[in-house]
Amino acid sequence: MNRSDVLIIGAGPTGLVLALWLSKLGVRVRIIDKSSSPGTTSRALAVQARTLELYRQLDLSQAVVQNGHRVGAANFWVKGEPVTRLPLSSIGEGLTPYAFLEIYPQDEHERLLIERLEAFGIRVERTTELEGFEETGDGITARLRLPDGQLEICQTCYLAGCDGARSIVRKTLDTGFPGGTYQQIFYVADVQGSGPAFNGELHVDLDEADFLAVFPLAGEGRARLIGTVRDERAERAETLRFEDVSSRAIEHMKVQVEQLNWFSTYRVHHRVADHFRTGRAFLLGDAAHVHSPAGGQGMNTGIGDAINLAWKLAAVLSGGAQAGLLDTYEPERIAFARKLVATTDRVFSFVTAEGRLADLLRTRVAPFLLPKVASLETSREFLFRTVSQITLDYRGMPLSKGVAGHVHGGDRLPWAHDGEGDNFESLKCLSWQVHVYGDTSDEMIAWCNEHHLPLHVFGWRPAFEAAGLGRSGFYLLRPDTYVAVAETCSDPKVIERYFRDHGIRPFFGSP
């Protein structure tokens, strides 16, 4: 009987990243997908800064940036003219190595992940479908329908449902999926064209209650149009054609469409599962939460789910932690998912609201306020931190402890760079580690050496103070680079006690 450590259902970005992380840590992975081949079209485009930071651990960031398209600015149009230009690169400057919005279509993204996964000898098993599963004490027994129609019974220690909004894993677990469906029909079109909206920047039309944006793609004259319709056209979504929706882009944003490469329509839901874990089965990505595409958050959130769960599964499976560590996955990720759904719902509701007041706010007030907001450093920083997901934290969660400087346990480690070095360089290692900014004690050095815990001591510099880091304390960092302990002293007993209390024996890097 086929037995794996982790059986992953679904080979979208979430499932592929989970498989890649686990494979890099020596976990026996099996990943299946009911589709016969990878997707050749996609809806997801944006790769946020936090995802690129985490991708450094998998040596993926450079490939994504090189093959994608960096968006330098967002333009807002009213009555056929661009009225506001918001420079994106300056908004996040100094906060992250990736102070920009990266456009990298999901189909290309998946091909990159599959290629890297195959380098570990792991292939996605296509045309293979999960029919059901049961927990059997020390594992899970799953029933798979194979490409030839045969039924396979296999065993796995843990099962990860990355199988989308219609997840068979979630349905088998009988987990509730409360929420609703937007009345609008979304459409997406890949086009070759020209015009002022094809200058490599993002363009958004604010004229009407229906959303319309032009996203640049890599390559001359390539763009993706994403929009909504809610009138009588929405009642016949299955027969909607590009010609039915293209006039607004042509008339309002002066788009000259030379070739239509792909067109599709779909409905969007906003839902969060009641639970992200039941026993040995986990829900990730769209199987756990779906929401409006506003802000380009969905795919990035699923990838965040995968990375959060991967290091915990690897630690438990290797004997580096007690099984209780897995209890922290749901509270850490479900809180963010609920907040995200509420936030994107508010943004989408504003952009698509109807009525004279809503029209006035969109076409008159927003174009006036946006540049004012962008000129204020605090507003700029808040906007970038939120959209880029670098503001996501696990404060107040069971694995988070202490505060040093302005950094709390559960925070993303702030990026500090002043030309002398980058404190993120050591984070490429998939392990627990300690960062000290300033001086540390001989006891800390000796303890870390004795326990093979990587210790990185950075001489104190103004850049660290500017980033909010505390001087001469320490930060214990989790394998997913979030701060576990922020401490003002340099006593290694704090680390020893933390590991003991949480049943963790640090799991160090790739085998």
Predicted regions and their residues:
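Helical substrate-recognition/capping region of FAD-dependent monooxygenase/halogenase enzymes
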Residues: M1-D5, I9, L25, K34, ...
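Core beta-strand elements of the Rossmann-like FAD/NAD(P) dinucleotide-binding domain
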Residues: N2-S4, D148-Y158
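N-terminal Rossmann-fold NAD(P) dinucleotide-binding loop
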Residues: G15-L16
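Glycine-rich FAD pyrophosphate-binding loop
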Residues: S23-R43
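Active-site-adjacent segment of FAD-dependent monooxygenases/related oxidoreductases
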Residues: T40-A44, Q48-L112, R116-E118
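FAD/FMN-dependent oxidoreductases across multiple families
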Residues: N67, A237-Q297, T301, A321, ...
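Conserved FAD-binding catalytic core of PHBH/FMO-like flavoproteins
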Residues: P82, E115, I122, Y158, ...
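A conserved short coil-to-beta-strand element within the FAD-binding core of flavoproteins
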Residues: R126-I140
